[in-house]
Amino acid sequence: MLRKCSDKQRKRMKRKVHIRKRVYGTAVRPRMTVFRSNRNISVQVIDDDARSTLASVSTLEKDFVLLRANVSSGLQIGEEIGRRLLEKHIDTVIFDRNGYLYHGVVAAVADGARKAGVKF
């Protein structure tokens, strides 16, 4: 799988594998993972024990279709995932940056979720 990737993607995949060895979500403290592309942002909250997604937000959803993958959109996506988590009475998560550097859009999603009241 890594042979077909570019150098930049290969480095991200190596970071992702290294991070996922240590990061594991449970029902009490699920894993919040961020995916970003050049155009969109997607955030999922995953219970790894049950192998299920508890909540998700994406710029592909009808309410956020005008947003793109930039810092201001990342803040809005983070606040929305925070609201959805608090509705389900989940206030603590483990943040999984999914191999991306903790900078820009990824950091904005985390800040938005913290602003909504989620702890990690």
Curated annotation (Swiss-Prot):
Any matching Pfam family: Ribosomal_L18p
Taxonomic superkingdom: Bacteria
Cellular component terms (Gene Ontology): cytosolic large ribosomal subunit
A single MF term (Gene Ontology): structural constituent of ribosome
Alphabetic keyword roster: Ribonucleoprotein, Ribosomal protein, RNA-binding, rRNA-binding
GO biological process: translation
Free-text function comment from the UniProt entry: This is one of the proteins that bind and probably mediate the attachment of the 5S RNA into the large ribosomal subunit, where it forms part of the central protuberance.
Stated family: Belongs to the universal ribosomal protein uL18 family.
The protein's name: Large ribosomal subunit protein uL18
